[in-house]
Protein backbone atom coordinates (compact mmCIF):
# COMPACT_ATOMS: atom_id res chain seq x y z
CA UNK A 1 0.00 0.00 0.00
CA UNK A 2 2.87 2.39 0.75
CA UNK A 3 4.68 1.85 -2.57
CA UNK A 4 1.40 1.51 -4.55
CA UNK A 5 3.03 -1.29 -6.51
CA UNK A 6 0.93 -4.19 -7.79
CA UNK A 7 2.20 -7.75 -8.12
CA UNK A 8 0.57 -10.96 -9.28
CA UNK A 9 0.52 -13.58 -6.53
CA UNK A 10 -1.53 -16.24 -8.35
CA UNK A 11 -2.05 -16.39 -12.12
CA UNK A 12 -5.61 -15.85 -13.32
CA UNK A 13 -5.64 -19.25 -15.06
CA UNK A 14 -6.06 -20.84 -11.61
CA UNK A 15 -9.16 -18.80 -10.77
CA UNK A 16 -12.66 -18.58 -12.19
CA UNK A 17 -15.43 -16.34 -10.88
CA UNK A 18 -18.90 -17.71 -11.56
CA UNK A 19 -20.76 -15.19 -9.39
CA UNK A 20 -20.03 -12.14 -7.25
CA UNK A 21 -18.18 -12.88 -4.02
CA UNK A 22 -17.14 -16.44 -4.91
CA UNK A 23 -13.37 -15.89 -4.55
CA UNK A 24 -11.83 -16.82 -1.20
CA UNK A 25 -8.33 -16.23 0.18
CA UNK A 26 -6.78 -15.50 3.57
CA UNK A 27 -3.48 -13.95 4.67
CA UNK A 28 -1.20 -15.95 6.95
CA UNK A 29 -0.46 -14.61 10.47
CA UNK A 30 3.07 -13.61 9.36
CA UNK A 31 1.71 -11.88 6.20
CA UNK A 32 3.98 -13.93 3.94
CA UNK A 33 1.53 -16.52 2.57
CA UNK A 34 -2.00 -16.97 1.26
CA UNK A 35 -4.48 -19.81 1.46
CA UNK A 36 -6.57 -19.66 -1.73
CA UNK A 37 -9.44 -21.64 -3.27
CA UNK A 38 -8.17 -22.40 -6.78
CA UNK A 39 -8.68 -24.57 -9.86
CA UNK A 40 -6.46 -27.62 -10.03
CA UNK A 41 -7.42 -31.29 -10.16
CA UNK A 42 -11.20 -31.01 -9.97
CA UNK A 43 -11.91 -28.15 -12.37
CA UNK A 44 -13.64 -24.84 -11.68
CA UNK A 45 -16.55 -26.37 -9.78
CA UNK A 46 -14.37 -28.65 -7.62
CA UNK A 47 -11.73 -26.34 -6.19
CA UNK A 48 -8.61 -27.25 -4.21
CA UNK A 49 -6.72 -25.28 -1.55
CA UNK A 50 -3.35 -23.84 -2.54
CA UNK A 51 -0.63 -22.35 -0.34
CA UNK A 52 0.88 -19.39 -2.20
CA UNK A 53 3.83 -17.21 -1.27
CA UNK A 54 2.79 -13.55 -1.12
CA UNK A 55 6.01 -12.12 -2.63
CA UNK A 56 4.91 -12.86 -6.20
CA UNK A 57 7.61 -15.48 -6.75
CA UNK A 58 5.00 -18.00 -7.87
CA UNK A 59 5.90 -20.53 -5.16
CA UNK A 60 2.78 -22.59 -4.52
CA UNK A 61 1.70 -25.97 -3.15
CA UNK A 62 -1.60 -27.74 -3.75
CA UNK A 63 -2.43 -28.77 -0.18
CA UNK A 64 -5.55 -30.87 -0.80
CA UNK A 65 -4.91 -32.53 -4.21
CA UNK A 66 -8.48 -33.75 -4.42
CA UNK A 67 -11.10 -34.23 -7.12
CA UNK A 68 -13.74 -33.15 -4.62
CA UNK A 69 -14.72 -29.60 -3.62
CA UNK A 70 -12.30 -28.16 -1.05
CA UNK A 71 -12.89 -24.55 -0.05
CA UNK A 72 -13.18 -21.85 2.63
CA UNK A 73 -9.70 -22.45 4.08
CA UNK A 74 -8.76 -20.58 7.27
CA UNK A 75 -5.53 -20.31 9.23
CA UNK A 76 -5.82 -21.65 12.78
CA UNK A 77 -3.54 -22.29 15.77
CA UNK A 78 -1.25 -19.34 14.94
CA UNK A 79 -0.69 -20.56 11.39
CA UNK A 80 0.35 -24.08 12.36
CA UNK A 81 -2.74 -25.57 10.73
CA UNK A 82 -5.73 -24.77 8.55
CA UNK A 83 -9.39 -25.77 8.64
CA UNK A 84 -11.47 -26.06 5.49
CA UNK A 85 -14.69 -27.46 4.08
CA UNK A 86 -14.79 -30.56 1.84
CA UNK A 87 -17.52 -32.79 0.40
CA UNK A 88 -15.30 -35.88 0.09
CA UNK A 89 -17.25 -37.81 2.74
CA UNK A 90 -20.72 -36.33 2.31
CA UNK A 91 -23.84 -37.57 0.57
CA UNK A 92 -24.15 -36.22 -2.96
CA UNK A 93 -26.61 -36.02 -5.82
CA UNK A 94 -24.89 -38.00 -8.57
CA UNK A 95 -27.57 -37.14 -11.12
CA UNK A 96 -27.51 -33.41 -10.45
CA UNK A 97 -25.76 -30.89 -8.17
CA UNK A 98 -25.19 -30.61 -4.47
CA UNK A 99 -23.31 -32.47 -1.75
CA UNK A 100 -22.94 -32.44 2.01
CA UNK A 101 -19.72 -31.16 3.56
CA UNK A 102 -17.50 -31.63 6.59
CA UNK A 103 -14.93 -29.45 8.30
CA UNK A 104 -11.37 -30.84 8.21
CA UNK A 105 -8.09 -29.71 9.72
CA UNK A 106 -4.60 -30.09 8.24
CA UNK A 107 -1.50 -29.53 10.38
CA UNK A 108 1.69 -27.95 9.05
CA UNK A 109 3.49 -28.61 12.34
CA UNK A 110 4.02 -31.97 14.04
CA UNK A 111 4.06 -30.58 17.59
CA UNK A 112 0.74 -28.77 17.05
CA UNK A 113 -0.75 -32.00 15.69
CA UNK A 114 0.33 -33.99 18.75
CA UNK A 115 -0.98 -31.31 21.12
CA UNK A 116 -4.36 -31.15 19.38
CA UNK A 117 -4.86 -34.90 19.87
CA UNK A 118 -4.23 -34.83 23.62
CA UNK A 119 -7.03 -36.16 25.82
CA UNK A 120 -8.67 -34.00 28.47
CA UNK A 121 -6.53 -35.60 31.19
CA UNK A 122 -3.30 -35.26 29.21
CA UNK A 123 -4.08 -31.60 28.51
CA UNK A 124 -4.74 -30.96 32.22
CA UNK A 125 -1.32 -32.39 33.14
CA UNK A 126 0.37 -30.28 30.46
CA UNK A 127 -1.40 -27.13 31.68
CA UNK A 128 -0.35 -27.88 35.25
CA UNK A 129 3.28 -28.26 34.22
CA UNK A 130 3.10 -24.99 32.30
CA UNK A 131 1.63 -23.18 35.32
CA UNK A 132 4.47 -24.39 37.53
CA UNK A 133 7.06 -23.37 34.95
CA UNK A 134 5.51 -19.92 34.49
CA UNK A 135 5.41 -19.42 38.25
CA UNK A 136 9.10 -20.29 38.61
CA UNK A 137 10.04 -17.87 35.84
CA UNK A 138 7.92 -15.14 37.42
CA UNK A 139 9.67 -15.62 40.76
CA UNK A 140 13.06 -15.31 39.07
CA UNK A 141 12.02 -12.15 37.23
CA UNK A 142 10.77 -10.52 40.43
CA UNK A 143 14.26 -10.75 41.92
CA UNK A 144 15.77 -8.71 39.11
CA UNK A 145 16.00 -4.96 39.38
CA UNK A 146 13.28 -2.77 37.86
CA UNK A 147 15.48 -1.34 35.08
CA UNK A 148 16.29 -4.74 33.70
CA UNK A 149 12.66 -5.72 34.00
CA UNK A 150 11.61 -2.65 32.02
CA UNK A 151 14.21 -3.40 29.35
CA UNK A 152 12.84 -6.92 29.05
CA UNK A 153 9.30 -5.59 28.59
CA UNK A 154 10.49 -3.26 25.85
CA UNK A 155 12.27 -6.14 24.10
CA UNK A 156 9.13 -8.25 24.37
CA UNK A 157 6.98 -5.49 22.90
CA UNK A 158 9.31 -5.05 19.94
CA UNK A 159 9.62 -8.77 19.24
CA UNK A 160 8.88 -9.36 15.52
CA UNK A 161 6.38 -11.91 14.27
CA UNK A 162 8.07 -15.27 13.79
CA UNK A 163 8.01 -16.44 10.14
CA UNK A 164 5.95 -19.59 9.66
CA UNK A 165 7.70 -22.86 8.91
CA UNK A 166 5.79 -25.63 7.14
CA UNK A 167 6.32 -29.38 7.25
CA UNK A 168 4.37 -30.04 4.06
CA UNK A 169 5.88 -33.44 3.30
CA UNK A 170 3.84 -35.03 6.11
CA UNK A 171 0.69 -32.94 5.77
CA UNK A 172 -1.49 -35.79 4.44
CA UNK A 173 -0.73 -37.82 7.56
CA UNK A 174 -1.99 -34.96 9.72
CA UNK A 175 -5.53 -34.52 8.39
CA UNK A 176 -8.49 -34.93 10.74
CA UNK A 177 -12.24 -34.72 10.17
CA UNK A 178 -13.64 -32.34 12.81
CA UNK A 179 -17.41 -32.56 12.29
CA UNK A 180 -19.10 -35.69 13.59
CA UNK A 181 -21.43 -35.99 10.58
CA UNK A 182 -21.78 -34.47 7.13
CA UNK A 183 -24.31 -31.70 6.47
CA UNK A 184 -25.02 -28.66 4.36
CA UNK A 185 -22.45 -26.36 5.96
CA UNK A 186 -22.15 -22.65 6.42
CA UNK A 187 -19.19 -20.95 8.08
CA UNK A 188 -16.97 -22.47 10.79
CA UNK A 189 -14.54 -21.18 13.43
CA UNK A 190 -11.98 -23.09 15.51
CA UNK A 191 -11.18 -21.46 18.84
CA UNK A 192 -7.72 -20.09 19.55
CA UNK A 193 -6.95 -22.97 21.91
CA UNK A 194 -8.27 -25.50 19.41
CA UNK A 195 -10.63 -27.02 21.97
CA UNK A 196 -13.96 -26.07 20.34
CA UNK A 197 -15.39 -25.85 16.83
CA UNK A 198 -18.35 -23.61 16.04
CA UNK A 199 -20.14 -24.17 12.75
CA UNK A 200 -23.43 -23.50 10.96
CA UNK A 201 -25.11 -26.63 9.61
CA UNK A 202 -28.48 -27.43 8.02
CA UNK A 203 -30.02 -30.81 8.84
CA UNK A 204 -33.73 -29.98 8.71
CA UNK A 205 -35.22 -26.53 8.05
CA UNK A 206 -32.45 -23.96 7.67
CA UNK A 207 -29.08 -23.46 9.32
CA UNK A 208 -28.43 -23.86 13.05
CA UNK A 209 -25.34 -22.97 15.08
CA UNK A 210 -23.52 -25.96 16.61
CA UNK A 211 -20.61 -26.38 19.01
CA UNK A 212 -18.29 -29.39 19.17
CA UNK A 213 -16.03 -29.72 22.22
CA UNK A 214 -13.01 -31.88 21.40
CA UNK A 215 -11.87 -32.45 24.98
CA UNK A 216 -15.33 -33.46 26.19
CA UNK A 217 -16.20 -35.13 22.87
CA UNK A 218 -19.64 -33.49 22.87
CA UNK A 219 -21.69 -31.80 20.15
CA UNK A 220 -24.57 -29.51 21.04
CA UNK A 221 -27.01 -27.14 19.38
CA UNK A 222 -26.53 -23.49 20.42
CA UNK A 223 -28.94 -21.47 18.26
CA UNK A 224 -31.77 -22.61 16.00
CA UNK A 225 -32.41 -20.93 12.67
CA UNK A 226 -29.35 -18.68 12.35
CA UNK A 227 -29.60 -18.77 8.54
CA UNK A 228 -25.99 -19.55 7.67
CA UNK A 229 -23.98 -16.36 7.87
CA UNK A 230 -20.36 -15.51 8.63
CA UNK A 231 -18.40 -15.85 11.89
CA UNK A 232 -15.45 -13.83 13.18
CA UNK A 233 -13.40 -14.45 16.35
CA UNK A 234 -12.10 -11.48 18.33
CA UNK A 235 -8.36 -10.87 18.78
CA UNK A 236 -8.24 -12.38 22.26
CA UNK A 237 -10.10 -15.51 21.19
CA UNK A 238 -12.72 -14.99 23.90
CA UNK A 239 -15.75 -14.33 21.71
CA UNK A 240 -17.09 -15.16 18.27
CA UNK A 241 -19.33 -12.77 16.37
CA UNK A 242 -22.01 -14.17 14.06
CA UNK A 243 -23.42 -12.07 11.21
CA UNK A 244 -26.54 -13.69 9.79
CA UNK A 245 -29.90 -12.67 8.37
CA UNK A 246 -29.32 -8.99 9.12
CA UNK A 247 -28.60 -9.74 12.78
CA UNK A 248 -25.48 -9.72 14.97
CA UNK A 249 -24.84 -12.18 17.79
CA UNK A 250 -21.96 -12.61 20.23
CA UNK A 251 -20.93 -16.09 21.40
CA UNK A 252 -18.92 -16.27 24.63
CA UNK A 253 -16.53 -19.17 24.16
CA UNK A 254 -15.88 -19.81 27.86
CA UNK A 255 -19.46 -20.73 28.78
CA UNK A 256 -21.05 -21.08 25.30
CA UNK A 257 -23.52 -18.27 25.95
CA UNK A 258 -25.03 -16.33 23.05
CA UNK A 259 -26.20 -12.72 23.18
CA UNK A 260 -27.86 -10.58 20.51
CA UNK A 261 -26.12 -7.31 19.60
CA UNK A 262 -28.60 -4.50 19.08
CA UNK A 263 -27.88 -1.93 16.40
CA UNK A 264 -29.70 0.64 14.33
CA UNK A 265 -28.96 1.49 10.73
CA UNK A 266 -30.82 3.62 8.22
CA UNK A 267 -30.52 3.89 4.47
CA UNK A 268 -32.26 5.81 1.74
CA UNK A 269 -34.26 3.32 -0.33
CA UNK A 270 -34.29 4.40 -3.98
CA UNK A 271 -35.63 1.47 -6.02
CA UNK A 272 -35.23 3.20 -9.39
CA UNK A 273 -31.54 3.89 -8.70
CA UNK A 274 -31.11 0.33 -7.45
CA UNK A 275 -32.54 -1.10 -10.67
CA UNK A 276 -30.31 1.21 -12.69
CA UNK A 277 -27.23 -0.09 -10.85
CA UNK A 278 -28.27 -3.75 -11.25
CA UNK A 279 -28.86 -3.22 -14.97
CA UNK A 280 -25.37 -1.82 -15.60
CA UNK A 281 -23.78 -4.39 -13.29
CA UNK A 282 -25.46 -7.21 -15.23
CA UNK A 283 -24.30 -5.76 -18.53
CA UNK A 284 -20.68 -5.56 -17.28
CA UNK A 285 -20.81 -9.09 -15.87
CA UNK A 286 -21.63 -10.44 -19.32
CA UNK A 287 -18.82 -8.40 -20.85
CA UNK A 288 -16.31 -9.74 -18.29
CA UNK A 289 -17.45 -13.34 -17.84
CA UNK A 290 -19.21 -14.63 -20.94
CA UNK A 291 -17.40 -17.72 -22.20
CA UNK A 292 -16.97 -16.27 -25.70
CA UNK A 293 -14.86 -13.05 -25.67
CA UNK A 294 -16.62 -12.00 -28.89
CA UNK A 295 -20.03 -12.47 -27.20
CA UNK A 296 -21.37 -14.49 -30.15
CA UNK A 297 -20.54 -11.63 -32.48
CA UNK A 298 -23.40 -9.41 -31.31
CA UNK A 299 -23.20 -5.68 -30.58
CA UNK A 300 -23.43 -5.94 -26.80
CA UNK A 301 -22.80 -2.21 -26.30
CA UNK A 302 -25.68 -1.48 -28.66
CA UNK A 303 -28.03 -3.80 -26.81
CA UNK A 304 -27.07 -2.14 -23.53
CA UNK A 305 -28.09 1.28 -24.86
CA UNK A 306 -31.28 -0.09 -26.44
CA UNK A 307 -32.57 -1.74 -23.26
CA UNK A 308 -31.37 1.03 -20.95
CA UNK A 309 -34.09 3.26 -22.43
CA UNK A 310 -36.76 1.19 -20.67
CA UNK A 311 -35.43 1.89 -17.16
CA UNK A 312 -37.26 5.21 -16.57
CA UNK A 313 -40.58 3.56 -17.45
CA UNK A 314 -40.26 0.55 -15.09
CA UNK A 315 -41.69 0.95 -11.59
CA UNK A 316 -41.54 -2.63 -10.23
CA UNK A 317 -39.06 -5.49 -10.03
CA UNK A 318 -41.25 -7.99 -11.88
CA UNK A 319 -41.16 -5.94 -15.07
CA UNK A 320 -37.49 -5.19 -14.46
CA UNK A 321 -36.66 -8.91 -14.30
CA UNK A 322 -38.54 -9.48 -17.56
CA UNK A 323 -36.62 -6.68 -19.26
CA UNK A 324 -33.29 -8.08 -18.03
CA UNK A 325 -34.25 -11.52 -19.31
CA UNK A 326 -35.07 -10.06 -22.71
CA UNK A 327 -31.67 -8.37 -22.91
CA UNK A 328 -29.82 -11.50 -21.77
CA UNK A 329 -31.82 -13.52 -24.29
CA UNK A 330 -30.06 -11.58 -27.05
CA UNK A 331 -26.94 -13.60 -26.16
CA UNK A 332 -28.56 -16.81 -27.40
CA UNK A 333 -26.69 -18.65 -24.65
CA UNK A 334 -27.79 -21.15 -22.02
CA UNK A 335 -28.29 -20.48 -18.30
CA UNK A 336 -29.03 -16.78 -18.73
CA UNK A 337 -31.98 -14.78 -17.48
CA UNK A 338 -33.38 -12.89 -14.50
CA UNK A 339 -36.21 -13.53 -12.09
CA UNK A 340 -37.73 -11.80 -9.10
CA UNK A 341 -39.59 -13.21 -6.14
CA UNK A 342 -40.75 -10.76 -3.50
CA UNK A 343 -40.43 -11.69 0.15
CA UNK A 344 -44.00 -11.85 1.44
CA UNK A 345 -44.72 -11.11 5.09
CA UNK A 346 -48.47 -11.67 4.67
CA UNK A 347 -50.01 -15.03 5.63
CA UNK A 348 -50.65 -17.40 2.74
CA UNK A 349 -54.27 -17.54 1.60
CA UNK A 350 -56.10 -20.77 0.88
CA UNK A 351 -56.74 -21.99 -2.66
CA UNK A 352 -60.24 -23.41 -3.10
CA UNK A 353 -59.45 -25.29 -6.29
CA UNK A 354 -62.00 -23.69 -8.59
CA UNK A 355 -62.22 -21.77 -11.86
CA UNK A 356 -64.45 -18.71 -11.80
CA UNK A 357 -66.76 -17.18 -14.40
CA UNK A 358 -64.96 -14.13 -15.76
CA UNK A 359 -68.14 -12.95 -17.48
CA UNK A 360 -70.08 -12.73 -14.21
CA UNK A 361 -70.56 -9.06 -13.23
CA UNK A 362 -72.42 -9.34 -9.94
CA UNK A 363 -71.05 -9.34 -6.38
CA UNK A 364 -69.04 -12.33 -5.26
CA UNK A 365 -67.27 -15.07 -7.23
CA UNK A 366 -69.34 -17.36 -9.47
CA UNK A 367 -67.87 -20.86 -9.73
CA UNK A 368 -67.65 -22.16 -13.27
CA UNK A 369 -65.72 -25.39 -12.64
CA UNK A 370 -64.43 -27.28 -9.60
CA UNK A 371 -61.00 -28.88 -9.94
CA UNK A 372 -60.96 -32.62 -9.25
CA UNK A 373 -59.52 -33.74 -5.90
CA UNK A 374 -59.48 -30.17 -4.63
CA UNK A 375 -60.80 -28.74 -1.31
CA UNK A 376 -64.31 -28.29 -2.80
CA UNK A 377 -64.72 -31.95 -3.80
CA UNK A 378 -65.28 -33.32 -0.30
CA UNK A 379 -68.23 -35.67 0.06
CA UNK A 380 -70.21 -33.37 2.38
CA UNK A 381 -69.73 -30.16 0.37
CA UNK A 382 -72.76 -28.29 -0.97
CA UNK A 383 -70.74 -26.20 -3.40
CA UNK A 384 -71.31 -26.94 -7.07
CA UNK A 385 -70.59 -25.19 -10.39
CA UNK A 386 -72.91 -22.18 -10.62
CA UNK A 387 -72.67 -21.36 -6.90
CA UNK A 388 -71.66 -17.84 -5.93
CA UNK A 389 -69.22 -17.21 -3.08
CA UNK A 390 -70.59 -14.06 -1.46
CA UNK A 391 -68.35 -13.76 1.61
CA UNK A 392 -64.95 -14.97 2.87
CA UNK A 393 -64.48 -14.87 6.65
CA UNK A 394 -67.51 -12.60 6.88
CA UNK A 395 -66.15 -10.06 4.40
CA UNK A 396 -68.36 -9.27 1.42
CA UNK A 397 -66.81 -9.80 -2.01
CA UNK A 398 -67.60 -6.88 -4.27
Regions found by a protein language model. Give the residues of each.
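A flexible loop/linker signature enriched in serine peptidases of the S9 family
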Residues: 1-3, 8-20, 29-32, 37-50, ...
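Predominantly a core beta-strand signature of beta-propeller blades
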Residues: 3-9, 57-61, 113, 174-175, ...
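Blade-terminus and WD-like Trp-Asp/Gly-His loop motifs, strongest in beta-propeller folds
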Residues: 25-34, 73-81, 188-195, 230-237
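PDZ/PDZ-like peptide-tail recognition elements
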Residues: 331-373, 377
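Conserved PDZ fold ligand-binding element
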Residues: 378-398
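A short helix->beta-strand "capping" segment at the edge of beta-propeller domains
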Residues: 163-182
Amino acid sequence: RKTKQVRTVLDGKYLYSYSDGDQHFQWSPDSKWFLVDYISVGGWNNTDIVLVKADGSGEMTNLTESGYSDNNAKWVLDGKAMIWSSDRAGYRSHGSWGAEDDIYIMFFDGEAYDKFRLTKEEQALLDEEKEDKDKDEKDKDSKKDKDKDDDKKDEKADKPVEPLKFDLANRKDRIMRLTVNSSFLGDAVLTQKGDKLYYCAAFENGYDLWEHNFKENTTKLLIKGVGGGTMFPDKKGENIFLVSGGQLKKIEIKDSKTKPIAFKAEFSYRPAKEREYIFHHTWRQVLDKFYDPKIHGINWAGYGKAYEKFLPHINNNYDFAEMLSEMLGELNGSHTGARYRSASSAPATASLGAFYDNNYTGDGLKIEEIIAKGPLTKADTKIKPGCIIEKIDGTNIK
